[in-house]
Amino acid sequence: MSKFWSPFVKDLVPYVPGEQPKLTRLVKLNTNENPYGPSPKALAAMQAELNDNLRLYPDPNSDLLKNAVAKYYGVQNNQVFLGNGSDEVLAHIFHGLLQHDQPILFPDISYSFYPVYCGLYGITFDAVPLDAQFRINPADYAKPNGGIIFPNPNAPTGCLLALEAVEQILKGSPDSVVVVDEAYIDFGGETAISLVDRYPNLLVTQTLSKSRSLAGLRVGLAVGHPDLIEALERIKNSFNSYPIDRMANVGAAAAFEDREYFDKTCALVIESREWVVAQLQAKGFEVLPSAANFIFARHPQHDAAGLAAKLREQGVIVRHFKQERIAQFLRISIGTPEQNQALIDGLGEL
């Protein structure tokens, strides 16, 4: 703590990112990165951008990428917002659209950045408990609020809320912004972007870090009513007018255009997920239904922290959370077949 800190900094509780180990020999199944590389077309586009133009500022509107997103989802350009990763997009949403008199609502088990943003921007919140099966009950959100946000599929549980249930939440809070955080939607869910033209209070966020294998590039987006997008543009241009650099603009646009590679790699992850689930269940694990590129599992006879430590000794890193309700669960990213086999081998006989 420093005497130079602003008063509010002393009370901030920052987000703790997943471990990024320096040892390359470790099997890294803790941060939900895609085990398959980016689209070759995305890599080629970025390589072509390595030229003298890097001395120039990028397009502040990122029109190339914005056009690609709009075309992909069948929306208008003024319904698309872009940011330096979906975390930045979410930060602008909390700052510009969720600061109201009423507390905002989000699940008690969800993305741990949400309460961090609330602390950063002075937003009150009500953490709504998931049910006994770790699922959202839409009726629990039909109460006065200053906004609603939830990940779908949920992080860290992986459970998916059906589009009909998302619509139920929207209908229950027509005067509040409802944010659906779809970081993992491409691994088994149906995007709520199809609803944005019917619900002016709906904002859908996505990332290119997961299904499009561009976590190192930092590109996120939001799709919604033009009024909501304009608010985010105002925040962006009061903070950083150039969040998407030249490499990200061309690489992300090419990734959206390469549907064949996207479909192939998503299918591989889904196939591997089902294999991992079956292997863990054979070892006695309870595995929650997952529509993400990770699974959430616990063993009735073994402590989760102990299992995580055992796996680490075998060179496999998974994610363990200390939050009381999920302290006996492990979140395990889906890797390549070889990485997944290393996970199962590392667990040994239980």
From Swiss-Prot:
Its cofactor is pyridoxal 5'-phosphate. It comes from the Bacteria. NCBIfam families: hisC (TIGR01141). The keyword Ion transport does not apply. Belongs to the class-II pyridoxal-phosphate-dependent aminotransferase family. Histidinol-phosphate aminotransferase subfamily. Keywords: Amino-acid biosynthesis, Aminotransferase, Histidine biosynthesis, Pyridoxal phosphate, Transferase. InterPro entries: Aminotrans_II_pyridoxalP_BS, Aminotransferase_I/II_large, HisP_aminotrans, HistidinolP_aminotransfase, PyrdxlP-dep_Trfase, PyrdxlP-dep_Trfase_major, PyrdxlP-dep_Trfase_small. Its EC number is 2.6.1.9. GO terms for molecular function: histidinol-phosphate transaminase activity; pyridoxal phosphate binding. It is an enzyme of class 2 (transferase). The lineage of its organism: Bacteria, Pseudomonadati, Pseudomonadota, Gammaproteobacteria, Pseudomonadales. This is Histidinol-phosphate aminotransferase 1. One of its GO terms (biological process) is L-histidine biosynthetic process. The gene is hisC1. It comes from Pseudomonas fluorescens (strain Pf0-1).
